Each structure stands twice: as C-alpha cells, then as structure tokens.
Amino acid sequence: PGIGAIHTQSYYTENNQLNAQNRMLAGDSPEEIINWLVANDVSSNPDIRQYGIIDFNNGSPRSAAFTGENCFDYKNHVLGLNYAIQGNILLGQQIIDSMESRFNNTSGCLSDKLMGAMQGANVVGADTRCMSEGTSSLSAFLRVAKPNDDPNAIFIDLNIAGTPQGIEPLDELQVEYNNWKNNNNYDCSTQGI
C-alpha cells in the first residue's frame, strides 16, 4: 500500500509475487521489476508468466507489463499512464480493448474504474475455459488499499472464488462491491480511492 500494485498471473507462483514486492519495496521501477523477474524466474521459465505493475513514483505514475510468449492464446497486455491490463486464454484483443475503454470511461474513484474495467470482460467465454459454463471467468476479485493500510487488512478486499455453473462471477462481484459501498456509506468524492 502507498507504493503501487503488482499482479502476477499465468502459472502463478507466490515466490515470483513476493520477489516482485521485494523489488518494489527496494525502489525498483515497474520496468526494472519485470526485467528482474524475467531474469530470475523461480522456475527459470518466464515465458509462461504474465505481469502487470504500476507505481505512484511520487505522483508521476509508471506502468509496465510482460506477457510471456508461451502463455496460452489469446494473450496480450496494454498499458496506460496509471494502469496495466493483461490477459491470457482470452477470446481475443477485443476483451482487453473493452476493459481499457471501460477503465478510461468509468467515472468515480479507482475502485469504480477497476470494477468498470472488469465489467468490460463480462462476456461469455472471455476466458475461453469458461465458454461451456456460460460465464466470463472462473472467479473475480477486487483489492484496493489506501496508502497507509496494513497489507493484511486493506480497504477493499472482495473475492468471488467460484460460482455454481452459469452464475457470472463478475456479476456476483459487482453485487458484493455495491453492497460494500452501501454498507460503508462510501463516497469516493469525499473519501478518496
């Protein structure tokens, strides 16, 4: 919290995530962290990994991403000044493009924009493994920390780990997020994030 965000996926290993966090705490830029991860992958196989990293850099955000050539297709990432969006096993580039458009065009605070971006992937089979389930994804989560949050007790930590067949995880996460906002009388115009 207060420094940036790191997301590792595609053959996720906790050690790579922890190494990335340690590099960020040591002051490395997002690009330096990715270069380090590629050179020091815990399994010596960075081509199956995917990373997205942003940092605040004292008010001048930076972003970087990496998509290994052996991640499952369709795979890609896109970067903006204050975001990194990545995906693999996708229907196609249109999923990433939709997420980016929704992030950029959703008003509100960061959590609203992140939720909007995820809704941009709310298409049956966006993750092609889920086509037969009639859903976009296997699970969905939203984690947002305030700058001074304890890493083990962050401001928003919602997780839909799985749903019965045909129940959309992103819709369930949207309900959880809306309930969280209502239950906490959350107004990002006055409370930030």
List each language-model region with its residue ranges.
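N-terminal nucleophile
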Residues: 1-193
